[in-house]
Amino acid sequence: MTSRANKDFRRAATLRAPVLKGTNVIPGLGVDVPELRRARGLWQVNRFDEALELFEKAVQLYPQNLVALIDASRALGARFEIARAEAMLDRLMKAARQRPDILHLAGQSYRMIFRPDRAIECFRRVLALTMELPDAYLELAILYERRHRVGEAFALIEDCLRAAPDYLEAELFKARLLRRMKDDVAAESLFRALATNTQAHPLVQAQAWAEIAQRHDRDEEYEKAMRAMLNCKKILLEREGVMRQQAEKVMGHLRGLVGSLTPAHFERWAQATETLPCKSLAVLTSFPRSGTTLLEQVLDAHTGLVSSDEREAFARDIFPAMWMTPATPLPTVQALDAIPVQRLAALRQRYWAYMEAALNEPIGTRVHLDKNPPLTVVLPGFLRLFPEARLLIALRDPRDVVISCFMQYLPLNSNSVYFLTLERAAQRYENDMAMWRKLREKIASPWLEVRYEDTVRNLEEQARRALAFLGLPWEPSVLGYRERLSQKAVASPTYEAVSQPLYTRAIGRWKNYQEFLEPGLPILQPSIDAFGY
């Protein structure tokens, strides 16, 4: 039996692993012209602005080339230039007419550029025209499941598997839907079959092992849960390559940057932007699995606030543009100090425009909340750009955080590579939160720490506290945040959990795995003590 290549549920169809590469002529789409190949090469080495110029040049030179329109739209969307991306896709849609293959590619592109409703429309049109594109069933099912339309998603997956019985990624998603539909026996049977299927892509196997681990955890079979999760992590460890070493190099530099800063730097930066229009914004950060998603969803239910959920815009695009030059490949205190006010003004506006584009609505007079746990390590840069920002820091028992980070599957990246062993996860937690503890003694910006344990025990009290900190009046409707989630897609990996009623069973979860966590406890002790756990 032959399996399709794993696509991490369609998230990997990006310019880093383009769908449209290989031969120079792509039937039905056009020529993969040299400009596009060079642009992809630049993109892969993070030379994004140069890549965008080449993508757009290709569209200008070859206006009928559908490959150029698709690649350019995805590149622009990835850089939050969404209006320009939509213009490209409008042209693609005119060319598509009744071609399901083009409509499918357009649907993928709309999904990538934060336009899920347009993506849904495209995939529906595909399925009305043909049953020969199983991917379209899976794409649409995933979009529905994110909106908790589980029954409709399941019907689509059944259709998908009738069209492509050997589509193992669809089998994996079917098993997840069965779990959500409370058919644990059928779900586990599928997960186990996939985990041990040597024809399945290793990442499909890894995800199946993670689901098996979660089932054992729910059944309080903690040793079995850990064994299953170790099988998942073993597969990922074999694929990490040099990712961890590269991440460690950057992290070491960021630690040094935080250590070099003084209160005087932050005071000086606040004074430097006094002439610029003040923005009403806040950052919600800390560390993954610390309760940021729950707090964000509660606050986002307030009429005076709008949140952006884990956008990459600042860390990937804005922050490097602040300081990066051929002579400054990594941020330094001197480089941050030397940023001219004109550049700060332009980048502040660029950040705001990116967020509004992804939200697909103006922020207006509302508070903008940038929820992003990994932002902790680049907070100096954010506060250089926006000294007026308020900081909400989510706290949770460090031991529970580390167990929670380890006990899930995440696609490999510079953050998740730390979650492949418990000891690494503990080291990364201590790294990030030690940086926060240093920063809170130096920064001039207001900050507030909110404990997950307090939030799940008394949501109203902590919601009132956070809203008051943000300068917003109390609105009882925020306590009904779950009603909004029934039709709202959440980007965080915890989108399913946050839609459930509040529960306290995750408090002290680490005790179930104490034997395995033991080597990491001394690493976490400074944070345990500092945060009062």
PLM segments and residue spans:
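Phosphate-binding active sites in nucleotide-utilizing proteins
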Residues: 275-386, 394
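PAPS-dependent sulfotransferases, especially Golgi type II membrane carbohydrate sulfotransferases
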Residues: 185-195, 199, 208-273, 333-338, ...
